[in-house]
């Protein structure tokens, strides 16, 4: 992730724009629901289990309820740019990886930087 710009950051909800350049491993959020509106790009996602996958593209809305495991295993056409709305506002450290070897909140952000 290179760009992560907050448009609004209220306690009840936050809205931000961010870009994804690489796959995102299976994870979930404990404290908030996540809505991702696809502004550009194309990829695949799954939620619940990895056999339940689908493709997404610009104009699609993805919704991940809190504590539901989800992933973006493939970026087909990138970068993918999302408008993300988290309800309530999500703490940036609220990301739990199913496989702890795939990262921490800090390493996830750091390792996805382009530079």
Where is each model-derived feature located?
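Short hydrophobic/aromatic-rich beta-strand segments that constitute the beta-sheet cores
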Residues: 4, 17, 45-47, 72, ...
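Short histidine-centered beta-strand/loop micro-motifs
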Residues: 25-30, 47, 54-55, 73-75
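A generic "binding-loop/recognition-motif" signal
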Residues: 22, 31, 52, 68-69, ...
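A short beta-strand-loop-beta hairpin characteristic of the jelly-roll/cupin
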Residues: 35-58, 68, 95-97
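Double-stranded beta-helix
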Residues: 8-11, 73-115
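A short glycine-rich, His/Asp/Glu-containing loop-to-beta-strand
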Residues: 1-26, 32, 85
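Conserved hydrophobic/aromatic beta-strand scaffold that supports enzyme active sites
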Residues: 15-19, 35, 53, 61-63, ...
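Conserved metal-binding segment of the jelly-roll/cupin
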Residues: 56-76, 85-87
């Amino acid at each position: 992730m290179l760009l992560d710009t907050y448009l609004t950051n209220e306690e009840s909800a936050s809205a931000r724009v961010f870009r994804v350049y690489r796959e995102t491993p299976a994870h979930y959020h404990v404290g908030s629901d996540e809505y991702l509106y696809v502004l550009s790009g194309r990829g695949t996602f799954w939620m619940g289990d990895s056999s339940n996958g689908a493709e997404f593209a610009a104009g699609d809305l993805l919704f991940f309820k809190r504590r539901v495991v989800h992933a973006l295993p493939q970026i087909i056409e990138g970068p993918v740019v999302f408008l993300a709305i988290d309800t309530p506002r999500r703490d940036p450290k609220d990301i739990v990886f199913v496989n702890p070897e795939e990262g921490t909140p800090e390493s996830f952000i750091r390792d996805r930087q382009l530079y």
